[in-house]
Swiss-Prot record:
GO terms for molecular function: DNA binding; endonuclease activity. This is Transposable element Tc1 transposase. GO terms for cellular component: nucleus. Keywords: DNA integration, DNA recombination, DNA-binding, Endonuclease, Hydrolase, Nuclease, Nucleus, Transposable element. It comes from Caenorhabditis elegans. The N-terminal region of Tc1 transposase has strong affinity for double and single-stranded DNA. Pfam families: DDE_3 (PF13358), HTH_Tnp_Tc3_2 (PF01498). One of its GO terms (biological process) is DNA integration. InterPro entries: RNaseH_sf (IPR036397), Tc1-like_DDE_dom (IPR038717), Transposase_5 (IPR052338), Transposase_Tc1-like (IPR002492). The gene is tc1a. Its main location: nucleus. Belongs to the transposase 5 family.
Amino acid sequence: MDRNILRSAREDPHRTATDIQMIISSPNEPVPSKRTVRRRLQQAGLHGRKPVKKPFISKKNRMARVAWAKAHLRWGRQEWAKHIWSDESKFNLFGSDGNSWVRRPVGSRYSPKYQCPTVKHGGGSVMVWGCFTSTSMGPLRRIQSIMDRFQYENIFETTMRPWALQNVGRGFVFQQDNDPKHTSLHVRSWFQRRHVHLLDWPSQSPDLNPIEHLWEELERRLGGIRASNADAKFNQLENAWKAIPMSVIHKLIDSMPRRCQAVIDANGYATKY
């Protein structure tokens, strides 16, 4: 019976104790209780845990991810020197979207000391666009209206390109994901007119973009500091952005071989990055 319980759980990790109980039931053997099933699984080290949420990746995109990872597996700082990494991110004015915990004595649930203040409608947020290279931090641009193809082009024309020419030089390679506004004809025409080279990028691959961890670094540096309004929040973000040392950037670029290897090992599925 124990062997059947473990086999059933390993065949499909999403099966519940009730599912396994029904699957292994046999007319010639007693039906194990759900408690027995759980105990056997725990003894074998198979504990029930909330699964990590990762985006679904199609077979076509998995193959493209593996191919890209293999092609760039051995690239280091020198190979990435002319590449500009970019992305957009949202930051809340009044804390994060995640769950928070508090340690409090029994009976003190409603004490102000142990409360987590909230603001109606979430308190607002600030959208930003940023970029960086292996040799320098790029600008952080505030997005104050709907981020469409026209504003995206404006960011390139007035912010990204002037900075890139001054800090990276001509012949830079720009990285972006495959969001529809990024790949629109309007934006593609701008790249062609300005002779900007694009890095071929596999869809559904945030784990290959090191800037994702730069957003986490920015959030960590703010340390939950609150802002009274959107202007104050952006000032906080910009100051923290400028204070990020190059040692952090170097670590992110140096992580690229590991990111690529992780994608290869996972056969294109989402990785821990």
